[in-house]
Amino acid sequence: MGLIVYYSSATGNTEHFVSQLGQRLFKIDKRKPSAFVGEPYVLVVPTYADGEGRGAVPKAVIHFLNEAENRKLIRGVIGSGNRNFGRYYSLASKIIAEKCGVPCLYRFELRGTDEDVICVKKGLERFWKQLG
């Protein structure tokens, strides 16, 4: 299986979710967001936006993806968010998928559900097999 790269804030929702996937994990450190992963990965990212949708992608994730080596290795993105924010729900994953030319594989709310975890595990298994 491939690598999961993720960013999680103080709430820990994203970290909680990815810890249930049984995958190799790499956390983007907001103090050192320019670390290189060196292999293909799927990015799991929360959304943080104001009432106008600004600031949806965490700055540490922007810095991480601005490194050409990291950007060329992204294969897909999974987003988390809060449905209370309506059209801005999981906006970061949509922005990243579009800018990086990769699929948005799944979206989950807050910490996700057991069903979300099962769906993502199965989906990632199929996804990595398809990529070969």
From Swiss-Prot:
It comes from the Bacteria. GO terms for biological process: protein modification process. Pfam families: Flavodoxin_NdrI. InterPro entries: Flavoprotein-like_sf, RNR_Ib_NrdI_bac, RNR_NrdI. GO terms for molecular function: FMN binding. Gene3D superfamilies: 3.40.50.360. NCBIfam families: nrdI. Probably involved in ribonucleotide reductase function. Belongs to the NrdI family. This is Protein NrdI. It comes from Bartonella tribocorum (strain CIP 105476 / IBS 506). The lineage of its organism: Bacteria, Pseudomonadati, Pseudomonadota, Alphaproteobacteria, Hyphomicrobiales.
